Design a protein with these regions (language model features):
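DNA major-groove recognition helix of helix-turn-helix/homeodomain DNA-binding modules
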Residues: 63-80
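Helix-turn-helix/winged-helix DNA-binding modules
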Residues: 32, 44, 59-62, 73
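Base-recognition residues in the alpha-helical recognition helix of bacterial helix-turn-helix
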Residues: 50-54, 65, 83
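Short alpha-helical DNA-recognition segment
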Residues: 24-54
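Residue-level signal for the short linker/turn that defines the boundary of a DNA-recognition helix
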Residues: 13, 34-35, 47, 62-65
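A short, Lys/Arg-rich alpha-helix, primarily the initiator
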Residues: 1-33
């Protein structure tokens, strides 16, 4: 049986893996860059990049709502977020940044 720390560390590793393998296309310039912690925080509805950093380090635990938002942002099932094999998979995604999003 997995311990709480194993689960938190798996989720943290998977979040970082998904973020660094996701690109964001800027709407005006069309430039494509890898997703930053700031961009992920904004997509999650927050302005606090420190929170994303703590999630990726496993020092803070995501709420069920935050986990749900992550699954929607990266278009991945919630159970896959807790799969230790995810970091061994091939995952690439491009998101078009919406300058009109609230």
């Amino acid at each position: 049986m997995e311990t709480r720390n194993n689960i938190v560390n798996t989720l943290a590793s998977n979040l970082r893996f998904l973020r660094i393998n996701t690109q964001v296309e800027e709407p005006i310039t069309g430039k494509v860059k890898f997703m930053s912690q700031r961009q992920l925080a904004e997509l999650m509805g927050s302005t606090c990049t420190q929170q994303v950093s703590k999630f990726e380090l496993g020092t803070n635990i995501m709420s069920s709502y935050q986990t749900y938002k992550i699954s929607k942002i990266f278009d991945i099932s919630i159970d896959k977020l807790f799969d230790a094999e995810l970091v061994k998979s091939v995952y690439k995604k491009t998101i078009k940044q919406n300058i009109y999003a609230e």
